[in-house]
């Protein structure tokens, strides 16, 4: 059998190794100059005034919600078809996650579905820019503004995603992920961007013990050695080892996303006559980052279930992923929201499958995936 082909693999090279070595030799391996450089570079990418590096996008979501004052009695609207970390952060703050349905074909939240879920207790909306494509940012943000509700864009899949010529995040506050499978990675990490000065100050403090400054800030700006706690906070800072990797990855992002686009276009072209159903592209002008390539596998039209297809591909040495099982079907949320019915989410959650897509894939790897899927489609 051929070597196992995972559905994703980090695209790391000699430049990342050299960047890590530089940090290790510098003597400053935790939050320091590389974080500062990364934040500045990310602001240039998205066009925001502030970028705040954190140890994960989950940490970023936590401090963003905290900085907005989200707590008991509040409601936060977000899709169920997302990674559970967003729901978990809402729940851990004592607030109520209001899970809504998505468009059946794009898997995006819509302004209509969001507005139908708004109540007098709604404090925030968290739209998900899914698989590398953007939700309808202008419409969602206009809705939030009209109702006086904060919007936090879940841009974990959206490094290099553009909406109407603007990078996702430019319009407000957004959270990106640098997890191992993301378009740019530093193993674990994330970035919050915002143009809200006061919100940025609160998030910076909350991510580092609730202090007004961190150790590097004190050293470089000559501030008092005894930093003051402004509010109880967390230790969500990013180490410079990770930031150095992320800086290199950011430089490679455009090239990596271009390769992802090439692979995705091959899949779209060469699987078009199979019963496996890809996601529809959003109607608004955008540049897709192709974080994931999703197929929907319906037993009635495909002759096998999603789980059976994933097993068949695994037996042929091809990895797949599931992004995501609907959050409201997970035990914790199922027990708390037993009557919740989201038909489009549930239909997709039972059928979605992520097939291999990463910049290090060769043309031969693509051939192998396409051939395996075509064979399964013909059975």
From Swiss-Prot:
Cofactors named for this entry: pyridoxal 5'-phosphate
Alphabetically ordered keywords of this record: Aminotransferase, Antibiotic resistance, Lipid A biosynthesis, Lipid biosynthesis, Lipid metabolism, Lipopolysaccharide biosynthesis, Pyridoxal phosphate, Transferase
Pfam family, one: DegT_DnrJ_EryC1
GO cellular component: membrane
Swiss-Prot/TrEMBL catalytic activity: UDP-4-amino-4-deoxy-beta-L-arabinose + 2-oxoglutarate = UDP-beta-L-threo-pentopyranos-4-ulose + L-glutamate
UniProt GO BP: lipid A biosynthetic process; lipopolysaccharide biosynthetic process; response to antibiotic
Listed pathway(s): Nucleotide-sugar biosynthesis; UDP-4-deoxy-4-formamido-beta-L-arabinose biosynthesis; UDP-4-deoxy-4-formamido-beta-L-arabinose from UDP-alpha-D-glucuronate: step 2/3; Bacterial outer membrane biogenesis; lipopolysaccharide biosynthesis
Entry EC number(s): 2.6.1.87
GO molecular function terms attached to this record: pyridoxal phosphate binding; UDP-4-amino-4-deoxy-L-arabinose aminotransferase
InterPro entries: ArnB_NH2Trfase, DegT/StrS_aminotransferase, PyrdxlP-dep_Trfase, PyrdxlP-dep_Trfase_major, PyrdxlP-dep_Trfase_small
Superkingdom as given in the UniProt entry: Bacteria
Gene3D superfamilies found in the cross-reference section: Aspartate Aminotransferase, domain 1, Type I PLP-dependent aspartate aminotransferase-like (Major domain)
Modified residues (N6-(pyridoxal phosphate)lysine): 182
Family: Belongs to the DegT/DnrJ/EryC1 family. ArnB subfamily.
UniProt subunit comment: Homodimer.
Function in brief: Catalyzes the conversion of UDP-4-keto-arabinose (UDP-Ara4O) to UDP-4-amino-4-deoxy-L-arabinose (UDP-L-Ara4N). The modified arabinose is attached to lipid A and is required for resistance to polymyxin and cationic antimicrobial peptides.
Protein name: UDP-4-amino-4-deoxy-L-arabinose--oxoglutarate aminotransferase
């Amino acid at each position: 059998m051929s070597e196992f082909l995972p559905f994703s693999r980090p695209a790391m090279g000699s430049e990342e190794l050299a960047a890590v070595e530089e940090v290790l030799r510098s003597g400053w391996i935790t939050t320091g100059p590389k974080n500062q450089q990364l934040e500045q570079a990310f602001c240039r990418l998205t066009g925001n005034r502030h970028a705040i590096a954190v140890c994960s996008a989950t940490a970023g979501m936590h401090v963003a919600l905290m900085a907005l004052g989200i707590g008991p009695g509040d409601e936060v609207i977000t899709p169920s078809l997302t990674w559970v970390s967003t729901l978990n952060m809402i729940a851990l703050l004592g607030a109520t996650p209001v899970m809504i349905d998505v468009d059946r074909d794009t898997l995006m939240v819509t302004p209509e579905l969001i507005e139908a879920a708004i109540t007098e207790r709604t404090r925030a909306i968290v739209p998900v820019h899914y698989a590398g494509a953007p939700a309808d940012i202008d419409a969602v943000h206009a809705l939030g503004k009209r109702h006086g509700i904060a919007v936090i864009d879940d841009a974990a899949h959206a490094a290099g995603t553009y909406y109407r010529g603007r990078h996702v995040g430019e319009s407000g506050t957004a959270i990106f992920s640098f997890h191992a499978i993301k378009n740019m990675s530093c193993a674990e990490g994330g970035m919050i961007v915002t143009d809200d000065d006061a919100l940025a100050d609160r998030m910076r403090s909350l991510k580092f013990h609730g202090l007004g400054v961190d150790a590097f800030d004190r050293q470089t700006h000559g501030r008092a050695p005894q930093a003051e706690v402004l509010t109880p906070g967390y230790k969500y800072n990013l180490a410079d080892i990770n930031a150095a990797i992320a800086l290199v990855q950011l430089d490679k992002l455009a090239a990596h996303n271009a390769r992802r686009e090439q692979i995705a276009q091959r899949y779209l072209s060469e699987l078009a006559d199979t019963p496996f159903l890809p996601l529809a592209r959003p109607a608004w002008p955008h540049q897709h980052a192709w974080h994931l390539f999703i197929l929907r596998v319906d037993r009635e039209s495909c002759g096998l279930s999603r789980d059976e297809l994933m097993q068949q591909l695994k037996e042929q040495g091809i990895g797949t992923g599931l992004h995501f099982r609907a959050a409201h079907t997970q035990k914790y949320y199922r027990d708390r929201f037993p009557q919740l019915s989201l038909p489009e989410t549930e239909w997709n959650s039972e059928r979605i499958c992520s097939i291999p897509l990463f910049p290090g894939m060769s043309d031969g790897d693509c051939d192998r995936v396409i051939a395996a899927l075509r064979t399964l489609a013909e059975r």
